[in-house]
Amino acid sequence: MEHELTSEGKCVFCSQILPQATLTKHLATHLAKIEKEDASKSPETYCHIVVDDGVMFLHLLVKGKASMKKIDTFLKDIWLECCGHMSGFGHKDFKVSTTHLVMDVFETKVKIYHDYDYGSTTRVFLKGIKNYKLKLKEDVILLSRNEPLKLICAKCEKHPAANICTVCDWDFFCESCSGKHEQECDDFEDYAKMPVVNSPRMGVCGYTGGHIDTERDGVHQ
């Protein structure tokens, strides 16, 4: 189903909703303008980083002197945390510790990964886009996030999906068809019914949603 989906996100600066493919360039225009305005204000290094799992993505602006732990915590809060599992960053050629500074890891356009839960692992990828000199207060700023995906019920093929059955081919069901599926699948009401959420962790372990940007964490309207 993933290849049939299209992904788009809202720009934090102008609220324009754009396709995933053009969002990076669009955000760069805003960031370059802010960098020019902040040039005389003793700015600090901020890293524009894209986190993705296919059609799901986050655009982050992270203070260069912040530790990678800041990103780890943010990813858990918005996308991943369910049962207190362990997590960490990695790269095929070098180690990435949560104590490393963000600006040191993303000095170039490096691509690393982040794993959450070493049992039922959810892996996402992080890529450094560009560093900017900016005068900001926050350590991590959410520049954009994919809007809720248009997942459709597998049974009626009409209404937005609200739940997943984790034992029946991970099929999606709307609220109405979820009730019907309970009559067909004994495990659905017991443990296999999981909510549709805007996260790569959807349907895994006990994940039911994040704690940041919750208005974009549900079913598409």
Positions of the model-derived regions?
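Short linear regulatory motifs enriched in tryptophan with gly/pro/ser
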Residues: 1-221
